[in-house]
Amino acid sequence: MEWGPGAGWSRGEAAGVDRGKAGLGLGGRPPPQPPRDERAQQLLDAVEQRQRQLLDTIAACEEMLRQLGRRRPEPAGGGNGSAKSGAPPQPSVSARGGLPKDAGDGASES
């Protein structure tokens, strides 16, 4: 039972990774990296920059929505409803031959 979870192997050893070379680049040397604090600061700066970009994008979208709202003060549904409010929709659609039953009637007459 040497292979069980209690065999005393670390995860790196179990995966065939030599503990001394874990995370090392070619030639056994670590890849060049800035010190940990400097790297953390770089990541924090990148996150803050991305956050500013997203906030700018949101602000631009909100401005576009405001401009669209000024151009079209009436909702899209309200414009369509007011155009048809005087007549029932059924006769106007059937007069244009838009209903499937009209297409069937036309085919039987010819």
Curated annotation (Swiss-Prot):
Chain positions covered by the region annotation Disordered: 1-41, 65-110
Keywords noted in UniProt: Coiled coil
Top-level taxonomic group: Eukaryota
Coiled-coil parts of chain: 38-68
Record-linked PANTHER family: RGD1559909, RIKEN CDNA 1110065P20 GENE
Name the UniProt record assigns to this protein: Uncharacterized protein C1orf122 homolog
Lineage start: Eukaryota, Metazoa, Chordata, Craniata, Vertebrata
